[in-house]
């Protein structure tokens, strides 16, 4: 074959042939090998190899047997015991790393690709307690040593008389035997001491791995506590009892500030020391180029590219505050992800370094090659630093978790025992009201679903007895919740009245009753069971935003509200903007609890197609109720209960105030009106919301008697009375949360009307329908 022809020839089954086949190239000439010659050559070589291997195996076994009996090769046996200890330490370390699950899935897959023996080596002796040889196996003498001892003792026992001539023979023998015994004892002691040292280092490896995992879990718990505190205090303070309401006014970054700082300091310190240990392994204990590829390591990335103050050895608190956006939750989460990746990378490189394949092929007593020296040289101060960081973070976490958020000092508890007791009773009543309303809402949804099924059944002309019994049973289930809700409402109002008026005598407390026009008191109703804050309530973990970010600011433009000063209105505006921002963060942090399809389904279950909330028009007076009769002229009874509901969003929750139907302002005194209108520093009365060029509010709402003004001033000055805000939130979150959702139009409900209606009635009806659609 010429040289020019050789360039175009590709041998079959060669690497070039396989490569070209993978690329899809077939326009080349294939030169197949002679298969018969290959087969003959392989068979001949195989037979020769088999005979040679058999001969070598027989000879090697004989030599090994003789060596085992030879007393001059005991040094090699000693080195083999040290080698067994070395392999045992490596296997024990690998088992600890794999069992503690400190490696992320990507690093496990990379180890399986680079060195599959590590995964199998860590699982070879899972049923055994230890990979290291026992002290008994180390101190056990071999056959030659046992034979020498047996022969010597037999000769001593058989010797009958001692003389000077015999002492010349047995004296040197005794000296040699004593020297042999001392050397054997020293060697056994050295091996046992090495085994104890390796056991200590195995315990250190196990402690370091477990501390790393515990620190990761503790940081995860701390971040969850920070997240829950921020979420609950801003968006769910009035719906859940997990966070005190007094912290709702703080900025998001001010919640658990000490815990945020502790998380940043400890995670940053552990990240830096783990990164230095990984770089030290790469520099002083290099492996092959495939394992030490720079693309497989985070530690080779410059720290200045990572940010968050990691490039500096010591960073001040002010610089850390600026670099992490006031120790914000997103920055802490990024730092936590960096720590997880760096920690897993350190243990991955350590596992590859301690692999049995990287051990010395033959027994070696060089201290630098022993694995426990490698371990101590690599980690240095890492275990102590990691333990100190975990202790600091655990102390801060326990303080904010168990002391700051739940307990009070003994002095405060003694000084404010009465006030705290009253607040706890009030909170228990409101909490019970929330749970009863939630259960009531669920039962009402089920009842409405059953009614829809019965109404949609065209074959059923009349209600069957079975359906009647079913409906009666459903109503019987609903009745206790309604009665309990009324009782909780009345008890909460009475608690507020007691806290405001502070009666001197306790005799009138039991006889005192609160009047409520909206919710009449049910007679002969047993008191409802109150649920304490300490009781486990599964619903507290359901974090779902009951607010709509699309609410405009037109609802809050009223300047005629007499309860708030301009500074307070500005503060409420800032809180509404903060609530919208927190809501956007909640969608990214917590995820959506329900899809849009499920929300539409809930809306259809909660409200029928006629249950449309009709807001007041600006040009209509407050006391005018004629549009109620024109919403559904055919069925006037459906208009009841859908008037005067103007929700407003404050602090991330919806507050709804219901006005009674056809209220006679002429027959209503000021005190009754003050009881109807809730007063709180967190709620703006919606009935006074009108434009500036319209008629002002009625006199009873703008001009108040001195007694009412004094009472409102006391309520306004008290920072502990936020009952109306919380109660309105419970009702809004459980009953009228979907009034801000986009309205679904299933058809024009005015198409089926008769064409013989008069022109005035048609005009009024069209105006009302446009109001509904608007």
From Swiss-Prot:
Annotated membrane topology: Multi-pass membrane protein
Coiled coil, from the record: 430-457
Key words of the record: Cell junction, Cell membrane, Coiled coil, Membrane, Nucleus, Transmembrane, Transmembrane helix
Domain of life of the source: Eukaryota
Compositional bias of kind Acidic residues: 746-757
GO terms for cellular component: adherens junction; nucleus; plasma membrane; stereocilia ankle link complex
Region annotated Disordered, chain positions: 746-774
Family designation: Belongs to the vezatin family.
Subunit composition and interactions: Interacts with myosin VIIa and the cadherin-catenins complex.
Protein name: Vezatin
